[in-house]
Structure formats: C-alpha cells, structure tokens
C-alpha cells in the first residue's frame, strides 16, 4: 500500500472522526480529485468500509446523500502507523550548513 503524505492526511482525518468526503476535504485541505481516489483505494484495500446515508436525512437538508467512510480494524492499524511515521519524520532536525562541508 502506498502511504503518501495525502493518504496519511486522509487516514488521520478518519482517525479524528471525519467520515464523509467533504468533511475530509475540509479537515485536510486536499481537493476532491485527491481525496476520493484515496478513499476508493483504501476501500479496495480493506482499510475502510463505506455506506450511503439514508436518503431521508439528505432530503431534510436539501442536499445529495453522503457516503460515509469508517476505518476497519486493519485500517486503524495502518492509519496509526502512517501518522506515527510522518510525525517521526517531522522531528528529524534539518541539516546544518551546506552539504560536503
């Protein structure tokens, strides 16, 4: 599984309780053309389950039905590992001086 930075952001958003595409886009700052392919890939790889909300809920708010995503137990493990890995990378100090000196 490719754990790119955008994929890690989506996984982190799911860990934090963001469950539908627009909510994930708001949480991550990523565009729909990035978020939805990642969600499809995570679904295909067994990291998330998805379900459509009941049409009545959407109708009440006069909007299209939302598709909700939830991490599976496997997905939760992958997400935690990915987030921890990127956090560790942020703690690596930047090199001092110029290379070769």
Which sequence ranges carry the predicted segments?
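Amphipathic alpha-helical dimerization/coiled-coil segments
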Residues: 1, 73-101
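N-terminal helix-turn-helix DNA-binding core of bacterial DNA-binding proteins
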Residues: 1-36
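Short, charged/polar surface micro-motifs in flexible loops or helix N-caps
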Residues: 16-20, 44-45, 75-77
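Short beta-strand element of the conserved SAM-dependent methyltransferase core
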Residues: 27, 69-71
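Basic amphipathic alpha-helical segments that dock to polyanions
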Residues: 35-47
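Beta-hairpin "wing" of winged helix-turn-helix
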Residues: 45-62, 70
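Exposed loop/turn and edge beta-strand positions of beta-sandwich/beta-sheet ligand-binding modules
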Residues: 65
């Amino acid at each position: 599984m490719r754990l790119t930075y955008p994929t890690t952001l989506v996984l982190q958003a799911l860990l934090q309780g963001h469950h539908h595409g627009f909510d994930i886009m708001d949480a991550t700052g990523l565009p729909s053309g990035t978020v939805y392919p990642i969600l499809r890939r995570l679904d295909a790889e067994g990291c998330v389950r998805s379900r459509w909300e009941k049409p009545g809920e959407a109708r009440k708010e006069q909007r299209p039905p939302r598709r909700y995503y939830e991490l599976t137990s496997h997905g939760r493990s992958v997400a935690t590992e990915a987030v921890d890995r990127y956090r560790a990378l942020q703690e690596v100090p930047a090199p001092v001086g110029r290379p070769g000196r």
